[in-house]
Amino acid sequence: MAFQLTPLRVALVAGEPSGDLLGASLLGGLHARLPASSRYYGIGGPRMSAVEFDAHWPMEKLAVRGYVEALKHIPEILRIRGELKRQLLAEPPDAFVGIDAPDFNFGLEQALRGAGIPTIHFVCPSIWAWRGGRIKKIVKAVDHMLCLFPFEPELLEKAGVAATFVGHPLADEIPLEPDTHGARIALGLPDGGPVIAVLPGSRRSEIELIGPTFFDAMELMQQREPGVRFVVPAATPVLRALLQPLVDAHPSLSVTLTEGRAQVAMTAADAILVKSGTVTLEAALLKKPMVISYKVPWLTGQIMRRQGYLPYVGLPNILAGRFVVPELLQHFATPDALADATLTQLRDDANRRALTDIFTDMHLALRQNTAQRAAEAVARVIDSRKPR
């Protein structure tokens, strides 16, 4: 990094919890790589704020899932983006890093790039999984892409976008061999007997749509596997309050409801029933058999079905290039089907051993010291724009 008279300024935008995790990891690397006087600001969550990040807006303002669901929030989201764009154009940062949230960030990045501000995007959109013209948007908006998965840079570079594979911070954070015994002690669960972790989502809309179905499936599983225990982590106090009535409505269930501690809950489990998302990668890194599911409103589902061309949605299956764990989506996600599939994952020891091998290979491939790699890439972009 060339000698810097004024403090470096890096603007970042993360729009949801997974982006907050990535942003916090990147900020840790940037604090180690860039001068101590550097400033970091923009939109982020609590993890980013904990590592000297100035959040001008909380990321919850952007964390809206689904095409239809987003419509009611569009005016406020556009207002925030417009105000942030004006701020950044008036006082240009040395670099802008958009963390996932492509619908919000690409338009902003294109405007900033047009004004000569270096733009970096962290998390390549699933151009390998979805139809449409996102690659064209990337070409217009992004100077450099930070990729979580090893096959992505080649796809981007063919389109003329510079890219760096940085791995995934979860692969750095999670040990290769999970401590199931220690996790059960931490949650007050007995060491013996089967435990199933159930994760119905990290948003109110997700829990409202699939939570009742998951709990009905839990009832069936307990009938078919007496002695099974369930642990259900709630991402926030608000979501815990939303889940509590479901727990109360099923008094026969042996269920532990936690606030946060999703990774501990999954570590303690023998099998996992999980709503699709980044958490499925976390489950794979913990070497756990799982069933992946989701339900979205009908119109959102129709749009997603027409845009997608891969036969799977779960990250473990996408990374493996084949179905290694079952997916039950939309109308296929019935309580009976979910119960059967989850109990099969629980009971099949040969499948468990095969998944452990597959998931260990994934873990090693993604364990790349992401914070350092990503920070080095950002520093190179900034340095390349400095006058010599």
Curated annotation (Swiss-Prot):
GO biological process, one term: lipid A biosynthetic process
A GO cellular-component term linked to this record: membrane
InterPro entries: Glyco_trans_19
TM stretches of this protein: none
One MF annotation (Gene Ontology) recorded for this entry: lipid-A-disaccharide synthase activity
Catalytic reaction annotation: a lipid X + a UDP-2-N,3-O-bis[(3R)-3-hydroxyacyl]-alpha-D-glucosamine = a lipid A disaccharide + UDP + H(+)
Annotated keywords: Glycosyltransferase, Lipid A biosynthesis, Lipid biosynthesis, Lipid metabolism, Transferase
Pathway the protein acts in: Bacterial outer membrane biogenesis; LPS lipid A biosynthesis
Family the entry assigns: Belongs to the LpxB family.
Listed HAMAP family: LpxB (MF_00392)
Name this polypeptide is given: Lipid-A-disaccharide synthase
Gene name per UniProt: lpxB
